[in-house]
């Protein structure tokens, strides 16, 4: 049951696309943080851009609850959270042509070759993301894994629905990014723009 003002959103039907007018109290540009983790990035973006709507997805219950508390403490009203696998949200729950920007920040690289089918960013996901994005919408990605970054670049080129460009906007760092930068790791980023 969804109550007014609640940050956590539970769809009435997980087999139909969301009706965004029921998710957010007001219309606005929609940005989606896939795998929002501890929620620091999501809440910081919601504070920076109060006129935009932010949807965070996370499969772990504890992370969803922690992020909800952060959003409530920050007083942001433009954040909603779904406790669902990110790939499922993109392929089944987001209506076509409604998303202005996706953020995929430090997804699990699944470094062993036999685990590559578990990687989030690959052909089917990219096709679904392109369908959910508005024309000119963006899929912004960061990782500390050079091999996965190369894999993503090849998958995006194979998809044919995106123009590849650099990520130029200075945005808040995630917990993982702060940790990896402190360890001296290289951070790879790109922004894919839907054609």
What are these regions, as identified by a protein language model?
Residues 1-32, 40-49, 69-96:
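S-adenosyl-L-methionine
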Residues 37:
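Conserved glycine-rich SAM-binding loop
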Residues 60:
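Conserved SAM/SAH-binding beta-strand->alpha-helix loop
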Residues 136-143:
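Conserved beta-strand signature within the Rossmann-like core of class I S-adenosyl-L-methionine
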């Amino acid at each position: 049951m969804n109550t007014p003002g609640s940050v956590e959103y539970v769809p009435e039907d997980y087999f139909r696309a969301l009706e965004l007018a029921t998710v957010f109290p007001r219309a606005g540009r929609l940005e989606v943080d896939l795998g929002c983790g501890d929620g620091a990035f999501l809440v910081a973006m919601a504070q920076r851009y109060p006129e935009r709507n932010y949807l965070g997805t996370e499969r772990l219950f504890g992370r969803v609850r922690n992020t909800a508390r952060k959003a409530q403490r920050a007083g942001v009203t433009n954040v909603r959270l779904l406790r669902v696998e990110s790939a499922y949200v993109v392929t089944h729950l987001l209506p076509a042509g409604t998303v202005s920007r996706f953020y995929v920040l430090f997804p699990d690289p699944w470094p062993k070759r036999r685990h590559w089918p578990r990687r989030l960013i690959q052909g089917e996901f990219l096709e679904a993301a392109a369908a959910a994005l508005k024309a000119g919408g963006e899929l912004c990605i960061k990782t500390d894994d050079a091999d996965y970054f190369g894999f993503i670049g090849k998958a995006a080129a194979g998809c044919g629905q995106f123009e590849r460009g650099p990520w130029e906007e200075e945005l808040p760092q995630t917990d993982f990014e702060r940790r990896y930068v402190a360890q001296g790791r290289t951070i790879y980023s790109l922004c894919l723009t839907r054609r």
